[in-house]
């Protein structure tokens, strides 16, 4: 795995406290607010007309939970992220034509949301470990694009 045992400890310890539904919904919502061009992939989700509409949109929250559940699964397979995310990579590349840069943006937003939710418990060491993980996941999701 690309994490040191200490980094893995930081990730595992914090992730055990994460509310996947709440954090996932907030992370995807913030992505859509901060990077509005990403909304084009979610036109079927209904009202995305304002930050409040986006953050309160049940479809955004539900998809955010789905995204973070997949991310959570990836945490159990850090030694094989490309294999773990191969199908999702293909779906997003071939069928949905998502710009792979968006995976990096979502990873960065996730780190911000975790910092927001966990405050002082989200130490610089924990942030560094999570940044490695979200970068690894983004690269795995972008794999089918190459």
From Swiss-Prot:
The keyword Chloroplast does not apply. GO terms for molecular function: haptoglobin binding; heme binding; hemoglobin alpha binding; metal ion binding; organic acid binding; oxygen binding; oxygen carrier activity; peroxidase activity. Residues 2-146 form the Globin domain. Heme b binds at residues 63, 92. Signal peptide: none annotated. Keywords: Acetylation, Heme, Iron, Metal-binding, Oxygen transport, Phosphoprotein, S-nitrosylation, Transport. It holds the Pfam family Globin. The modification Phosphoserine is found at residue 44. The modification N6-acetyllysine is found at residues 59, 82, 144. Belongs to the globin family. This is Hemoglobin subunit beta. It comes from Lemur catta (Ring-tailed lemur). The lineage of its organism: Eukaryota, Metazoa, Chordata, Craniata, Vertebrata.
